Each structure stands twice: as C-alpha cells, then as structure tokens.
Amino acid sequence: MDLVRGLHNLAPRHRGCVATIGNYDGVHLGHQHIIAALRERASSAGVPAVVVTFEPTPREYFEGAAAPSRLTRLREKLEALESCGVDRVVVLRFDDRMRSMGATEFVDRLLVDGLAVRHVVVGHDFHFARRREGTIETLRAAGA
C-alpha cells in the first residue's frame, strides 16, 4: 500500500483513482462496507482504491484535549486499511488551511487537480469542507 502525506506530495502518478474520504478511526464494519464498495468500483475502473484521511482528526483539531480518544493510532489505521485491500492512503494535515477550505476548493484542489478521481464512495451522511458545507450532492454536482 502506498502512503502519501500531504496535498503537496501528490504527484502525476497519483492521478486517476476511486476514492473515499473520512477519518476511518477503528475501521469498523461500516467502514469495511464502504471500502469493499470502493475496491469493487476501483477494480471495475482499473484504477487504485484510495482512502483520504486527516491528521489530526477534525475533532482533535477543533476540540483539542476534549476530543474523544482515538480507537486506533495512525499506524494502526494504516495497517487496518492495508489489510482491507486499499491501494493508497492520502493523509492530509488538518490545520487552519484545511479548516477554512470550502467545498468547491476541496473538490477542485484535491479530487480534481490532485487525484483526478473517477468516482467517490462515501457513506449516506457524508459531509466535508468548511463548516461541513460539502455533501453527497456537492460531489454529484462536481461529477464525482
């Protein structure tokens, strides 16, 4: 499994994939279901299955010491994702820049320019970007 740390480390060879986005703490049964769908979609398209996750988690960023404890450390999360058959994990630093990024910029910079995603696989209650403004409908409108 490949590991890419930071948006700035995405290279042309990382373009073209099916991706999912989330914290993936614990990689529980719900996560495993999403990852299975991700792998199936990626296999059908002949591209890598990619998980995009954040370090620290958004809750840790916003809540600091009051944030709930993680179920898994980053290394354990990466091992669990690898055992689920993920081809690549992109770990994005959750900082002031990421916090303030709007949904359109997130889609454009990461999903279009950075990863050239063919499809995004997420859960039914997925939200992303500044103030959780991005939704599944945002992704659909962008063609992901």
Q: Model-flagged regions — what are they?
A:
Residues 1-144:
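Nucleotidyltransferase catalytic core that binds NTPs
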